[in-house]
UniProtKB/Swiss-Prot annotation:
Name of the molecule in the record: GMP synthase [glutamine-hydrolyzing]
UniProt xrefs under PROSITE patterns: GATASE_TYPE_1, GMPS_ATP_PPASE
InterPro entries named in the record: Class_I_gatase-like, GATASE, GMP_synth_C, GMP_synth_GATase, GMP_synthase, GMPS_ATP_PPase_dom, NAD/GMP_synthase, Rossmann-like_a/b/a_fold
All residue ranges annotated as the GMPS ATP-PPase domain in the record: 208-400
Start and end residues of each Glutamine amidotransferase type-1 domain: 9-207
Name of the top EC class for this enzyme: ligase
Gene3D superfamilies recorded: 3.30.300.10, 3.40.50.880, HUPs
CDD domains to which the protein is assigned, alphabetical: GATase1_GMP_Synthase (cd01742), GMP_synthase_C (cd01997)
GO molecular function terms noted in the UniProt entry: ATP binding; GMP synthase activity
Active-site residues per Swiss-Prot or TrEMBL entry: C86 (nucleophile), H181, E183
Keywords: ATP-binding, Glutamine amidotransferase, GMP biosynthesis, Ligase, Nucleotide-binding, Purine biosynthesis
The organism of origin for this protein: Salmonella paratyphi B (strain ATCC BAA-1250 / SPB7)
Length: 525
């Protein structure tokens, strides 16, 4: 009997903020299970979930609009602590008798909050002190509207020069509201505030740990598939590798891993995957050479969304064919993780926009013949890596930079051709090799090369050549929801450029991408 790791849990109501998923990630980092639901849940659903506490997220709407989202009134009647963040604070204030107004002074970015009154939420938490000894907190604001009157049974805990009610509290009911975003790293003490709310005020134990998550996942897999056989597409990436190890632990030889060499992989990746999982870990692996099939399906296609859908469709076709060669395979396992789901579809509030479909999610056809097993779909990337370490996977593999499911299919811009993939593989291998040699690989969060379908004139010796262009991309990020371009040294970039142009015949120019996320995404397609 596995321990109930969902015993203490936090319910996060999503009002559509771009930061909502970060709130969930922070709560999980504190060792507490949480779920992210749409704001318009019913009282019965909340009762059934039985949360230890509720967090109301931020959102893009204005609480002053007549039809703007509101928290279910039961949230404030359930007898559990409630923490409103930004929009969540504003709707809490309005619903409990306070007042919110639109403001000409939009507060966006860094702000300093002065703590005026003692509160369980921020007691003993400070970044600095005022001249008269009052605590100051460095926070990140992102709001237009602001609370102009708090409910009568609340007190003002903190304020800024332009925001008189930056933190409000009803200590007796354990209701708290903050006008800033504690979940983002720019709010320096934000994690401590969330910890104070989740662990102390809600009294949640740290039951959500890698070892316990593994036990729970193994039990769920066994319950879902029983004695059925499962097929998994194993790419050697973090997500599919951890999925393979979890399934191997749960069902052993009833798992067949299919390694599809689709012609869209990194240099020497096929050999590395077969060696590690076949020879070292002893998993049952079928190697399927399918480069020609994928490239034929992609021929003539320039649209990024269409390419992702094609790659997803052909993957499923290959899996179906391999499954038919085996007896009674009823389940297709995938390494879908929580950010895949978040980025691929609008949130249940309908406020988030579809950015791109992931081949693990949006690219799967409705007529897929097998059931889906997705043991990682509620986990963030950092949780997946920690689970992988617990399962015995090597650190270097788990902390390798992310690689997209469609592979080079979305790193070759426009039409995908074998010639382009071969050039890109070699250029990318040089970039990664030089990053490791310069001890820069672990200092950036993700680095890769993009093939641009653009020819540029170059000079080699006494002759001119007219060859292809590649772009180097390196970013720094904590959560992959936002990212800064990495300021790599000029001499390093020059060395990489020289090597690529001299060693990869067919590339005449190398550029460096200096776009952040937002407005750009990390991948080009």
């Amino acid at each position: 009997m596995t321990e109930n790791i969902h015993k203490h849990r936090i319910l996060i109501l999503d009002f559509g903020s771009q930061y909502t998923q970060l709130v969930a990630r922070r709560v999980r980092e504190l060792g507490v299970y949480c779920e992210l639901w749409a704001w318009d849940v019913t009282e019965a659903q909340i009762r059934d979930f039985n949360p230890s506490g509720i967090i109301l997220s931020g959102g893009p709407e204005s609480t002053t609009e007549e039809n703007s989202p509101r928290a279910p009134q039961y949230v404030f009647e359930a007898g559990v602590p409630v923490f409103g963040v930004c929009y969540g604070m504003q709707t809490m204030a309005m619903q409990l008798g306070g007042h919110v107004e639109g403001s000409n002074e939009r507060e966006f970015g860094y702000a300093q909050v002065e703590v005026l009154t003692d509160s369980a939420l921020v007691r003993g938490i400070e970044d600095s002190l005022t001249a008269d000894g009052k605590p100051l907190l460095d926070v990140w604001m992102s709001h237009g509207d602001k609370v102009t009157a708090i409910p009568s049974d609340f007190v003002t805990v903190a304020s800024t020069e332009s925001c008189p009610f930056a933190i409000m509290a009803n200590e007796e009911k354990r209701f708290y509201g903050v006008q800033f975003h504690p979940e983002v790293t720019h709010t320096r003490q934000g994690m401590r505030m969330l910890e104070r709310f989740v662990r102390d005020i809600c009294q949640c134990e740290a039951l959500w740990t890698p070892a316990k998550i593994i036990d729970d996942a193994v039990a769920r897999i066994r319950e879902q598939v029983g004695d059925d056989k499962v097929i998994l597409g194993l790419s050697g990436g973090v997500d599919s590798s951890v999925t393979a190890m979890l399934l191997h632990r749960a069902i052993g030889k009833n798992l067949t891993c299919v390694f599809v060499d689709n012609g869209l992989l990194r240099l020497n990746e096929a050999e590395q995957v077969m060696d590690m999982f076949g020879d070292h870990f002893g998993l049952n692996i079928v190697h399927v050479p399918a480069e020609e099939r994928f490239l034929s399906a992609l021929a003539g296609e320039n649209d990024p969304e269409a390419k992702r859908k094609i790659i997803g469709r052909v993957f499923v076709e290959v899996f179906d064919e391999e499954a038919l060669k085996l007896e009674d395979v009823k389940w297709l396992a995938q390494g879908t993780i929580y950010p895949d789901v978040i980025e691929s579809a609008a949130s249940a509030t309908g406020k988030a926009h579809v950015i791109k479909s992931h081949h693990n999610v949006g690219g799967l056809p409705k007529e897929m013949k097998m059931g889906l097993v997705e043991p990682l779909k509620e986990l963030f990337k950092d949780e997946v890596r920690k689970i992988g370490l617990e399962l015995g996977l090597p650190y270097d593999m788990l902390y390798r930079h992310p690689f997209p499911g469609p592979g080079l299919g979305v790193r070759v811009l426009g039409e995908v051709k074998k010639e382009y993939c071969d050039l890109l593989r070699r250029a990318d291998a040089i970039f990664i090799e030089e990053l490791r040699k310069a001890d820069l690989y672990d200092k950036v969060s993700q680095a890769f090369t993009v093939f641009l379908p653009v020819r540029s004139v170059g000079v080699m010796g006494d002759g001119r050549k007219y060859d292809w262009v590649v772009s180097l991309r390196a970013v720094e990020t904590i959560d992959f929801m936002t990212a800064h371009w990495a300021h790599l040294p000029y001499d390093f970039l020059g060395r990489v450029s020289n090597r690529i142009i001299n060693e990869v015949n067919g590339i005449s120019r190398v550029v460096y991408d200096i776009s952040g996320k937002p407005p750009a995404t990390i991948e080009w397609e």
